[in-house]
C-alpha cells in the first residue's frame, strides 16, 4: 500500500504514541504541538495491565523502567498525621492487578521524553502551532494551521486532550461538546520544595477530610513533594473561575480546603507560591464514534475516563496501539514505494481501519467508563461528615489488616474483563 500522509494535532502521550507506531510503519507523519517546545510538565502517572504490554511491544520497556519512581506504597493518615492504613506496592509478576502504587509510577514529562526520543528522527515535529480549521474533501483533508500554512493530508488525528479542538470541529457547529463535567468535582496539582528526611520513604500519603475533601502528597525525588488537593467543591468561586485564571482558581481551592486538618494550612501557604499550579475540572469524554471521514480521535480527546478510573495513561497507549494496528492491517506499510494512484482506495482502506479501531477498542473503554456520568462520576469514596470519615478510616484499616488490594480490586479499573489485546504482526516487524 502507498505511504499515508498523516497529521497529528497534539504532542502529548497519545500523540507521541500514535506517531511512534505510524512512523515505524513507514508513513509520513507530522506532529503539531501548540506549546513552543515539548511539553514535559505534569505530575506522576502510572501504567497498568495492557498498557505495560503495549510498552513492551514498543520496545521501550527498559527506557521507561529507568524513569520509574520507586514508591513504596500508599498510606492513609488521619487529621493528626497518624497512619490509619498502609497498602504496599504489589508485585504482579505472578499475576493479578496492581495496587494504588503501580510498578510503573513515572512522571508525565519522562513518559513524553521517552516517546519523543524514540520518534523524533522519524516524524516531523512542529512546535508553537496547531490546527485552526480543516475541510474533508473526500480524496484528502485540507488543513490550515494557526501559522496560516495550508496542506493536504490523508488522515488527521486529534490527540489534543480533553478540551480537544479537533473533536469540537469534527462534531460540527451547534453540536454540544461531549466533555461531561462531574458535578463540582475538582483536583489541583502543584509541587513544593521539600528535602527528604533521613528516615523518610517514597510514599503516597492520603488524607480524607469531612466535606468530601482530599489532600495527598507524593515524592518523586529527594528535593520536592507533589501535592494534590481537591474534592467535591460546591461554590461560586470555582464554578465561575475562567479556565486558566490561575489566581482565581488558587483562591477557590484555598477557600475549599481551609481548615481541613493534617498539613492543609502548610500546603495552602505553598499553594500561594506555586508556579506550576494546575486545576482540573474532573469529567469524562464519551462519544458514539471516534472518527468522521478522514478525521480520527485518540487519547483523552476521544474517551477521557477521568483520574477516578486510574486508567488514563494506559488507555492512551492501548488506544494508540489499536488505531495504528488497524491502519497497518487495512492500509499496510508506507515504505514499500507504491504510488498513491487511487485516492478512493486509500479512502476505503482508511474507513475500514477506523471502523476496526472502534470495533476493537470501544469494548475496552466501555468497561473503563462503565457507570460514570455527570452524577455518578462524583462517587469519590470521600464522605461529607466527620462520622462518615471515621467509618471510612475504620473500613480502610480493616481492609489493610486483611491484606486486601482495595485500590486494585475496587477503585482502579485495571482488570478489563473478556478483552484481549489484539495482535498486529505488522506493527512488530522491523
From Swiss-Prot:
<keyword id="KW-0285">Flavoprotein</keyword>
<dbReference type="GO" id="GO:0016114">
    <property type="term" value="P:terpenoid biosynthetic process"/>
</dbReference>
<protein>
    <recommendedName>
        <fullName>FAD-dependent monooxygenase asL4</fullName>
        <ecNumber>1.14.13.-</ecNumber>
    </recommendedName>
</protein>
<dbReference type="Pfam" id="PF01494">
    <property type="entry name" value="FAD_binding_3"/>
</dbReference>
<dbReference type="InterPro" id="IPR051704">
    <property type="entry name" value="FAD_aromatic-hydroxylase"/>
</dbReference>
<feature type="binding site">
    <location>
        <begin position="33"/>
        <end position="34"/>
    </location>
    <ligand>
        <name>FAD</name>
    </ligand>
</feature>
<comment type="function">
    <text>Flavin-dependent monooxygenase; part of the gene cluster that mediates the biosynthesis of xenovulene A, an unusual meroterpenoid that has potent inhibitory effects on the human gamma-aminobutyrate A (GABAA) benzodiazepine receptor. The first step of xenovulene A biosynthesis is the biosynthesis of 3-methylorcinaldehyde performed by the non-reducing polyketide synthase aspks1. The salicylate hydroxylase asL1 then catalyzes the oxidative dearomatization of 3-methylorcinaldehyde to yield a dearomatized hydroxycyclohexadione.</text>
</comment>
<keyword id="KW-0547">Nucleotide-binding</keyword>
<keyword id="KW-0521">NADP</keyword>
<feature type="binding site">
    <location>
        <position position="108"/>
    </location>
    <ligand>
        <name>FAD</name>
    </ligand>
</feature>
<feature type="binding site">
    <location>
        <position position="278"/>
    </location>
    <ligand>
        <name>FAD</name>
    </ligand>
</feature>
<comment type="similarity">
    <text>Belongs to the aromatic-ring hydroxylase family.</text>
</comment>
<feature type="binding site">
    <location>
        <begin position="11"/>
        <end position="14"/>
    </location>
    <ligand>
        <name>FAD</name>
    </ligand>
</feature>
<dbReference type="InterPro" id="IPR002938">
    <property type="entry name" value="FAD-bd"/>
</dbReference>
<dbReference type="InterPro" id="IPR036188">
    <property type="entry name" value="FAD/NAD-bd_sf"/>
</dbReference>
<keyword id="KW-0274">FAD</keyword>
<keyword id="KW-0560">Oxidoreductase</keyword>
<dbReference type="GO" id="GO:0016491">
    <property type="term" value="F:oxidoreductase activity"/>
</dbReference>
<dbReference type="GO" id="GO:0071949">
    <property type="term" value="F:FAD binding"/>
</dbReference>
<comment type="pathway">
    <text>Secondary metabolite biosynthesis; terpenoid biosynthesis.</text>
</comment>
Amino acid at each position: 500500500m502507498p505511504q499515508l500522509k498523516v497529521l497529528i494535532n497534539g504532542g502529548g502521550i497519545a500523540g507521541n504514541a500514535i506517531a511512534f507506531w505510524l512512523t515505524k510503519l513507514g508513513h509520513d507523519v507530522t506532529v503539531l504541538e501548540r506549546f513552543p517546545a515539548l511539553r514535559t510538565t505534569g505530575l506522576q502517572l502510572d501504567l497498568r495491565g495492557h498498557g505495560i504490554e503495549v510498552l513492551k511491544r514498543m520496545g521501550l520497556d527498559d527506557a521507561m523502567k529507568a524513569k520509574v519512581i520507586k514508591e513504596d506504597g500508599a498510606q492513609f493518615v488521619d487529621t493528626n498525621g497518624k497512619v490509619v492504613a498502609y497498602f504496599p506496592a504489589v508485585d504482579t509478576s505472578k499475576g493479578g492487578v496492581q495496587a494504588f502504587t503501580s510498578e510503573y509510577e513515572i512522571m508525565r514529562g519522562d513518559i513524553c521524553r521517552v516517546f519523543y526520543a524514540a520518534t523524533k528522527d522519524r516524524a516531523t515535529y512542529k512546535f508553537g502551532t496547531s490546527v485552526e480549521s480543516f475541510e474533508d474533501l473526500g480524496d484528502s483533508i485540507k488543513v490550515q494551521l494557526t501559522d496560516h500554512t495550508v496542506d493536504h493530508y490523508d488522515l488527521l488525528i486529534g490527540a489534543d486532550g480533553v478540551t480537544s479542538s479537533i473533536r469540537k470541529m469534527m462534531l460540527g457547529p451547534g453540536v454540544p461538546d461531549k466533555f461531561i463535567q462531574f458535578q463540582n468535582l475538582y483536583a489541583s496539582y502543584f509541587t513544593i520544595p521539600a528535602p527528604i528526611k533521613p528516615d523518610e520513604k517514597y510514599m503516597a500519603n492520603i488524607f480524607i477530610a469531612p466535606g468530601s475533601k482530599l489532600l495527598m502528597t507524593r515524592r518523586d525525588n529527594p528535593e520536592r513533594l507533589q501535592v494534590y488537593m481537591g474534592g467535591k467543591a460546591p461554590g461560586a468561586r470555582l464554578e465561575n473561575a475562567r479556565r486558566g485564571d490561575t489566581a482565581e482558581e488558587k483562591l477557590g481551592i484555598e477557600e475549599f480546603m481551609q481548615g481541613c486538618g493534617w498539613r492543609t494550612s502548610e500546603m495552602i501557604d505553598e499553594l500561594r507560591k506555586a508556579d506550576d499550579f494546575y486545576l482540573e475540572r474532573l469529567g469524562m469524554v464519551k462519544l458514539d464514534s471516534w472518527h468522521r471521514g478522514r478525521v480520527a480521535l485518540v487519547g483523552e480527546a476521544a474517551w477521557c475516563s477521568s483520574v477516578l478510573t486510574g486508567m488514563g495513561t494506559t488507555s492512551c497507549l492501548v488506544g494508540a496501539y489499536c488505531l495504528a494496528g488497524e491502519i497497518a492491517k487495512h492500509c499496510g506499510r508506507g515504505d514499500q514505494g507504491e504510488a498513491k494512484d487511487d485516492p478512493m482506495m486509500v479512502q476505503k482502506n482508511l474507513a475500514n481501519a477506523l471502523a476496526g479501531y472502534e470495533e476493537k477498542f470501544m469494548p475496552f473503554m466501555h468497561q473503563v467508563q462503565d457507570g460514570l456520568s455527570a452524577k455518578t462520576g462524583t462517587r469519590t469514596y470521600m464522605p461529607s461528615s466527620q462520622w462518615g470519615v471515621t467509618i471510612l478510616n475504620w473500613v480502610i484499616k480493616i481492609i489493610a489488616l486483611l491484606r486486601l488490594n482495595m485500590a486494585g480490586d475496587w477503585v482502579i479499573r485495571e482488570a478489563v474483563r473478556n478483552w484481549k489485546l489484539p495482535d498486529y504482526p505488522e506493527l512488530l516487524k522491523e
